[in-house]
Amino acid sequence: MSFIPHKLEQIKKMLDTIGASSVDQLFDEIPRHLRADTLNIKDGINEIQLANLMRKRANKNHHNINYIGAGAYSHHIPAAIWDIVARGEFYTAYTPYQAEASQGGLQVIYEFQTMMAGLTGMDASNASMYDGATALAESVLMAIRSNKKAKSQKVLIAEALHPTYLRVLETITKHQGIEFDIVNLDSKNGKTDVTKLEDFANTNYAAVVIQSPNFLGQLADVDGITNWAHKHGALVIAVTNPMSLAILKSPAEWGDNGADIVCGEGQPIGVPLASGGPYFGFMTCKMAHVRQMPGRIVGKTVDLDGNEGFCLTLQAREQHIRRAKATSNICTNQGLMVTAATIYMSLLGAEGLERVASISHENTQTLATELAKINGVSIRFNSAFFNEVVIDLPVNAETFVTEMEKEAIDAGYFLGEYHSDLANSIMVCATEIHTSEDIKEYIEATKKVLARIGG
């Protein structure tokens, strides 16, 4: 019995309509060597036999210890979180337009907004964006709309911004007349030299983007850059790891007046690694800019009987109300991921988040210190970091990473793809899930691999 709902004639008609010659052509962007022509399953096997076959194949997967980081982080997620998220009341992609039928979901989003505003020190938060990269792109568009005093649509970006974020930012803003200037990082400390900003002092910018911790794991001179930006009439967009804010000062405390908009990737707070997603982006801002904020915003109100309730608010900003004048064409939020993050933050509390962040930093410090004791291995930058650090190796880093996989360790992020000067460098990340025994195994594996490949 075939479970495919379409007949061959129907498939041909659909392909003709879109101008494709075959179903395979719909997937031609996938390289041929990655495609499977068959599932290699015998004909006529029953469901029990099929399940046993799949289990045997699944057992061939190797679960390496992960030290990669670079924007997606391995944190422990208590079992209770996704048990609650998977309940039918939450397990939906529905956007809660009908407040009278959605009070539970709306309250979760409201609690999320409250927590994110508190974590970042801002006045308001939206209900989330697609991911960290799109949250940054929307933040740039928001800043340009909001900065009425700016005489240009130029944005200044510190070079150590996550490269994927920069590519997404350029893609989304490509046809909107927005220009970007890049401030080169200091090769000695892996972050922006504030004195270099004076080279851009004669250019009018609508916004300045600061990532801290930056892509290389270093803590930026957020006070100096923020004050410089405000002095020159630019809004400050902070890109940050929410977990780091449990032990670092909030963007609201950067410089004399704080950042204006804060965004980033929410994956570290309750969302598992899953081949790139789904994750969620967060965005918070000062109240002065809230009417230019994209996405859903949930507010708390009272009904005619004086009962407390929740509803979507400031909806005139959104495309389902005023399409031509909407702040964005984003038409949903990552509600399920937001639910997980809300439960995660509620379950851990402020002290729990601080403990996770502190242990992550301490484990990274220990790993880096022990690696630097190995002959030929060193810490590249002599500056403060959170839970990622760049390590210089005496061998090609890509080869090292490949060899470490044979030791069941994902050793770190190969930085040669990011910058040609870093071909012998990797970025390593440790979190609270890495034990002292794990770190010892990493050190011993490093010695073994370097001896094997000639380091």
From Swiss-Prot:
Keyword Oxidoreductase: yes
EC number: 1.4.4.2
Catalytic activity field: N(6)-[(R)-lipoyl]-L-lysyl-[glycine-cleavage complex H protein] + glycine + H(+) = N(6)-[(R)-S(8)-aminomethyldihydrolipoyl]-L-lysyl-[glycine-cleavage complex H protein] + CO2
Name assigned to this protein: Probable glycine dehydrogenase (decarboxylating) subunit 1
Superkingdom classification of source: Bacteria
Enzyme kind, highest EC tier: oxidoreductase
Keyword Methyltransferase part of the UniProt annotation: no
Single GO molecular function: glycine dehydrogenase (decarboxylating) activity
Single biological process term from Gene Ontology: nucleoside metabolic process
Subunit composition and interactions: The glycine cleavage system is composed of four proteins: P, T, L and H. In this organism, the P 'protein' is a heterodimer of two subunits.
Protein family according to the UniProt entry: Belongs to the GcvP family. N-terminal subunit subfamily.
The entry's keywords: Oxidoreductase
Physiological role: The glycine cleavage system catalyzes the degradation of glycine. The P protein binds the alpha-amino group of glycine through its pyridoxal phosphate cofactor; CO(2) is released and the remaining methylamine moiety is then transferred to the lipoamide cofactor of the H protein.
